[in-house]
From Swiss-Prot:
It comes from Heteractis magnifica. It is found in: Secreted; Nematocyst. This is PI-stichotoxin-Hmg3b. The record marks 14-15 as: Reactive bond for trypsin. Disulfide bonds join 4-54, 13-37, 29-50.
Amino acid sequence: GSICLEPKVVGPCKAGIRRFYFDSETGKCTLFLYGGCKGNGNNFETLHACRAICRA
């Protein structure tokens, strides 16, 4: 889906939550630390969920 093409958004908060996003340049789901607020759709709780939705 189109959410997989959205940029990684850490957001302004500082929670440091382990999440995964789809990196459209590499075609892979990658770990990042999410701040906890004001993110976007390219933000998955698990690697499996990221791969399932973005077909990585």
